[in-house]
Swiss-Prot record:
It holds the Pfam family BRCT. One of its GO terms (cellular component) is cytosol. This is DNA ligase. The lineage of its organism: Bacteria, Pseudomonadati, Campylobacterota, Epsilonproteobacteria, Campylobacterales. It comes from Helicobacter pylori (strain ATCC 700392 / 26695) (Campylobacter pylori). The active site is at K112.
Length: 656
């Protein structure tokens, strides 16, 4: 909280420094959430002391200044930034101010993409200039680089002068690949996709931009001479020119509809192809927009409804080591608890000791932590400017934390080689029951942990000796649940050979390699290293891993194959796939279903379907539960076949 004019001036200077690093240098010093918190405190102080507002306050200007790297270029019409709202009450207040004066107003809602704003100027149907937002009045001319963005049309079917505005982004998938390349090359990593997009767009060498797989998603227009009546009409016109459509776009009439779409976006956020940080809300009627006008910095007819933060700063207070099924040791940081998106986070993965060394992460460091859905949070980088001498190196362990067996230290990974290590056995069983292995429904991590604690199982063979009374000893198990699990275990017998090979959890051998091996018959694992090397796609590491695994586990493998009697081919499974209406079809699931979506997704994948998180013209089926949200409207718009849960179950039953 700012208490004096002196603190107010200091806060302005600090926020301007943060903005410079974020917008101009592409090197954020703090997370978006921390910046927003500091900014809101500044704004609150100014609301109480309006006579003392400084012209250089970040509340009075749009984020970036132009640098010396590119020529400056003015926008024909100013590019504004949006005011933020952070909760229901702030949104309600914003809506009431508009609806009180304009009760008939409607609102266009769309995802707020976390990228770099770009203004494209077209004259006589040709792209003539591309300019970053900059300070809103002028930006940096990046035309050569923009022309390397694949989905920006160089020509459009409209001859008038028009500015088309949108966000330059990099998909999560391409961002991860880019950072992996930089890690391998010992280059500094991008902090997040937004900074990767900005750094890639503002390259002096446009060939680098070309390689970065940037995308442009339009969200509006600047200067033009068209007679639109609504904002939605304007967006539809942009798409008709050949630009990408905005996914999850919706037209809403009241607070509840807006909230529903906001929470739909939060639910779909993790599966969305790009990083989102909120939802943009814009008054649809252009005559109302004109009457509402602008503040010093922002339009009064639009706002950004921000998501809860997924990125925070905290301190590493310790490191523990976990053991995987292959024996690989994964270091996990113990953190000072920090709330991220409604969850209290107290640990995050450090991946491996090679990465710790490359990123120069130390014990007692302040670090940037991100959370992605239900996956364990991860540490992006240390904040070296916070170091005070109390930090020290995170040492590689020499013995297994579970069985105390001496560890093998390779260049990247550290391994426990004890095949009877309890941690390895437990993780092996979790993999054995997983969806790409034997797919035993109801046999998840927590159940396997309980079975180990009760000393009911020690390896996969023990699963098939379990009795009803054994399972009744487990927490929350009653007769029906216990019987269902026994039935699922029994059903896993006679699996396709590739599934059983994959279930063994052999290092370097995944689903694809298992399918290749299965083509060579039931005795394939007895082959020599030379014979494995002759197989398509198999290298030295894979061949040696297979030979070593079989040599160490011959008796276990023979017993397991005898008990489960795998099918020599998966012809039955492939036949079911090929006869399935869902084979090679793209399917999206939405809304509330009677079973978890993941369970239906697995059933459909087993029938050859491809599961997607977003609806497009390429979607074949939408499975719609209760409260399907905007995906249903989008599916209907694209002519996608829509099935409710009852219809889906009927079709699945027909395939049995």
């Amino acid at each position: 909280m700012i208490k004096s004019q002196k603190e107010y001036l200091e806060r302005i200077a600090y926020l301007n420094t943060l903005s410079h690093h974020y917008y101009n240098l592409d090197e954020p010093i703090v997370s978006d959430a921390i910046y927003d918190e500091l900014y809101q405190e500044l704004k609150a102080y100014e609301e109480k002391n309006p006579n003392g507002i400084q012209a250089n306050s970040p509340t009075q200007k749009v984020g970036a200044t132009t640098t010396n790297s590119f020529n400056k270029n003015p926008h024909l019409m100013r590019m504004w930034s949006l005011d933020d709202v952070f909760n229901q009450s702030e949104l309600q207040a914003w809506l009431q101010r508009i609806l009180k004066a304009y009760p008939s107003a409607s609102f266009v809602c769309s995802p707020k993409l976390d990228g770099v704003s770009l203004n494209l100027l077209y004259q006589h149907g040709k792209l003539v200039k591309a300019t970053t937002r900059g300070n809103g009045l002028e930006g940096e001319l990046v035309s050569a680089n923009a022309k390397h963005i694949a989905n920006i049309p160089h020509a459009i079917a409209y001859n008038g002068e028009i500015e088309i505005r949108g966000e330059v982004i990099i998909s999560k998938k391409d961002f991860d690949a880019l950072n992996q390349e930089r890690l391998n090359a010992n280059e500094p990593l991008f902090a997040n996709p937004r900074n990767a997009a900005s750094g890639s767009l503002r390259q002096l060498d446009s060939e680098i931009t070309k390689k970065r797989k940037l995308q442009f998603i339009p969200w509006g227009v600047g200067k033009h001479s068209l007679n639109f009546l609504s904002f939605k009409e304007c967006l539809d016109f942009i798409v008709s020119l050949g630009f990408s459509a905005i996914q999850y776009l919706s037209l809403n009439k009241n607070h509840q509809e807006i909230e529903d779409n906001y929470h739909t976006l939060i639910r779909e956020r993790e599966g969305f192809f790009a990083l989102l940080d909120g939802m943009v809300i814009v008054v649809n009627e252009l005559n109302i927009q004109k009457e509402l006008g602008y503040t010093q910095k922002s339009p009064k007819f639009a706002c950004a409804y921000k998501f809860p933060a997924l990125e925070k700063h905290t301190k590493i207070v310790g490191v523990i080591n976990q053991v995987g099924r292959s024996g690989a040791i994964t270091p996990v940081a113990l953190l000072e608890p920090v709330e991220i998106a409604g969850a209290m986070i107290n640990r995050a993965t450090l991946h491996n000791y090679s990465e710790i060394e490359k990123k120069n992460i130390m014990l007692s460091d302040r670090v940037v932590v991100i959370r992605s859905g239900d996956v364990i949070p991860k540490i992006i980088k240390p904040l070296e400017s916070y170091r005070d001498g109390s930090q020290h190196k995170i040492e590689r362990p020499k013995v297994c934390p579970i069985c105390s067996h001496e560890l093998l230290c390779e260049e990247i990974f550290t391994y426990c080689q004890n095949l009877n290590c309890p941690a390895r056995l437990k993780e092996s069983l979790i993999h054995f029951a997983s969806k790409d292995a034997l797919n035993i429904q109801g046999l998840g991590d927590k159940v396997i942990e309980q079975l180990f604690e009760e000393k009911l199982i020690f390896n996969a063979l023990d699963l098939y000796a379990l009795k009803l009374e054994d399972l009744m000893r487990l927490d929350k198990f009653k007769i029906k649940k216990a019987q269902n699990l026994l039935d699922a275990i029994l059903k896993s017998k006679n699996p396709p050979l590739w599934r059983l090979i994959n279930a063994l959890g052999i290092e370097h051998i995944g689903k694809g390699a298992s399918k290749t091996l299965a083509k060579y018959g039931l005795n394939v694992l007895e082959k020599s290293e030379a014979e494995f090397l002759e197989m398509e796609g198999f290298g030295v590491e894979m061949a040696r891993s297979l030979v070593n695994f079989y040599a160490s586990n011959q008796e276990f493998i023979r017993s397991l194959f005898e008990l489960l009697n795998p099918k020599n081919s998966d012809m039955a499974e492939e036949k079911q796939k090929s006869s399935s209406v869902f084979n090679n079809k793209t399917i999206v699931l939405t809304g509330t279903l009677s079973k978890p979506r993941q369970e239906y997704a697995q059933m459909l994948e087993n029938l050859g379907a491809k599961i997607s998180s977003s609806v497009s013209a390429k979607t074949d089926f939408l499975i719609a539960g209760e409260n399907p949200g905007s995906k249903l409207a989008l599916a209907q718009k694209h002519g996608v076949s829509v099935l409710n849960e009852e219809e889906l179950l009927k079709r699945l039953k027909e395939l049995d």
